[in-house]
């Protein structure tokens, strides 16, 4: 159908139009009207006359600007230029003003929204530091789960209720020091225990007995501590030793008695350094579950100290075994058969089990480094206690004499 006086064939399909005359004015207007038809389906039932009515055209422009629909600058300018030929200047100017007002409102909305385009350098560094701290915290937490934690609550909760011992007894109050002396005198008279060595002395003395580590890993010798560690692993439902399970362990079964936990952990640390390669290759399931640190601290260290105990106390004199004739301990130092003798080791195991209390209350509160001895004596003077009677130095000197 041809509109009056226009001679235009309109083929309407989703806002696409064609014209025989190629009138630029009508073509641009039709395209603009067609674009609006895509977004506003209500214009589909407009008649051909309505589509080209000046009032309708202006109404469409006003509605577009009122609804704040974005109009491309080039298309808008071209359209208004073409409309100026058929519309009075006042109407065209009003339409332009309306469009400009709509554009200003749009810009105001955009400006009012605070957008963060990028993070400041200091913000990035702050986040990186915070994330690193979190990672370090997780790493520390994992190490605490798989290593010996010198924590009062852990150790105190690990002992039975009837014999609950706490590292709080190692604190330097007057009552605790008096109690420590009583425990020391009781055990020394009953078991004739050797003096407490400083850490450097202890590591030097136990070094010849460390080859037992490889013999345990290779299954050449049975180990009471390994047996207990394996039972703990089998009774666990977790892939590794957790803090909760560690707290539930009875540390009496993993403590080298009168040597105390502090000295035991020093030996375990040295073993982990010396046998790192062997401990990280072909790990048995029990070792994997415990982790290298705890396995060294609570299995290999007490076994090494068991051999040292046999040597220090010359337990062969208390054994009826025919395998241990009257040999000087120094001559027997490198004889594995002597230190691996089941009867001798059972004597040592029993002694260590019976002297756990001594290890916790006495050994762990005795100076482990030589420079700590002076601090101990200064504390005794502050509490107005007799230094000679209460200091650990007395027991080291008297025993050696």
Swiss-Prot record:
Q: What does this protein do?
A: May be involved in a process influencing telomere capping.
- Where does it localize? Cytoplasm; Nucleus
Q: Would I find Phosphoprotein among this entry's keywords?
A: yes
What are the record keywords, sorted? Cytoplasm, Nucleus, Phosphoprotein
Q: Where is the composition biased (Basic and acidic residues)?
A: 35-48
Protein's UniProt name: Restriction of telomere capping protein 4
User: Which parts of the chain are coiled coil?
Assistant: none
Taking the first listed entry, what is the main subcellular location of this protein, grouped into a coarse class? cytoplasm
GO cellular-component terms in the record? Answer: cytoplasm; nucleus
Q: Where is this region: Disordered?
A: 35-59
Give each disulfide bond as a residue pair. none
| Residues modified to Phosphoserine | 23
User: What Pfam families does the annotation carry?
Assistant: RTC4 (PF14474)
Q: Report the leader peptide range.
A: none
> Further remark, if any?
Present with 799 molecules/cell in log phase SD medium.
Query: Is the Cytoplasm keyword given for this protein?
Result: yes
Provide the family line: Belongs to the RTC4 family.
């Amino acid at each position: 159908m041809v509109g009056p006086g226009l001679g235009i064939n309109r083929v309407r399909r989703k806002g696409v139009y064609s014209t025989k005359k190629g009138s630029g004015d009508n073509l641009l207007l039709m395209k603009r009207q067609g674009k609006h038809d895509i977004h506003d389906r209500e214009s589909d039932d407009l008649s051909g006359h309505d589509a080209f009515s000046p009032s309708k055209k202006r109404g469409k422009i006003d509605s577009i600007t009122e609804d704040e629909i974005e109009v491309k600058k080039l298309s808008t300018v071209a359209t208004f230029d073409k409309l100026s030929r058929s519309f009075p200047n006042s109407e065209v100017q009003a339409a332009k003003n309306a469009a400009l007002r709509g554009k200003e409102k749009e810009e105001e909305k955009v400006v009012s929204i605070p957008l963060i385009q990028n993070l400041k350098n200091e913000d990035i560094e702050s986040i990186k530091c915070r994330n690193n701290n979190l990672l370090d915290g997780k790493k520390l937490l994992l190490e605490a789960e798989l290593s010996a934690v010198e924590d009062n609550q852990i150790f105190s909760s690990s002992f039975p209720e009837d014999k609950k011992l706490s590292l709080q007894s190692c604190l330097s109050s007057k009552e605790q020091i008096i109690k420590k002396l009583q425990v020391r005198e009781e055990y020394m008279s009953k078991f004739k225990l050797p003096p407490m060595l400083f850490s450097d002395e202890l590591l030097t003395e136990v070094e010849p007995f460390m080859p037992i580590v490889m013999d345990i890993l290779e299954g050449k010798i049975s180990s009471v501590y390994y047996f207990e560690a394996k039972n703990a692993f089998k009774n666990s439902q977790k892939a590794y030793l957790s803090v909760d399970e560690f707290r539930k362990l009875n540390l009496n079964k993993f403590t080298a008695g009168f040597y105390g936990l502090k000295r035991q952990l020093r030996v375990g640390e040295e073993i982990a350094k010396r046998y790192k390669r062997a401990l990280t290759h072909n790990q048995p399931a029990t070792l994997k579950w415990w982790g290298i640190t705890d396995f060294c601290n609570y299995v290999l260290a007490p076994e090494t100290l068991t051999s040292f105990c046999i040597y220090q106390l010359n337990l062969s004199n208390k054994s009826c075994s025919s395998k241990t004739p009257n040999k000087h301990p120094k001559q027997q130092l490198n004889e594995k058969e002597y230190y691996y003798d089941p009867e001798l080791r059972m004597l040592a195991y029993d002694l260590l089990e019976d002297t756990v209390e001594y290890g916790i209350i006495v050994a762990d509160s005795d100076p482990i480094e030589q420079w700590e001895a002076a601090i101990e004596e200064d504390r005794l003077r502050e509490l107005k206690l007799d230094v000679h009677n209460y200091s650990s130095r007395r027991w080291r000197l008297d025993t050696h004499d």
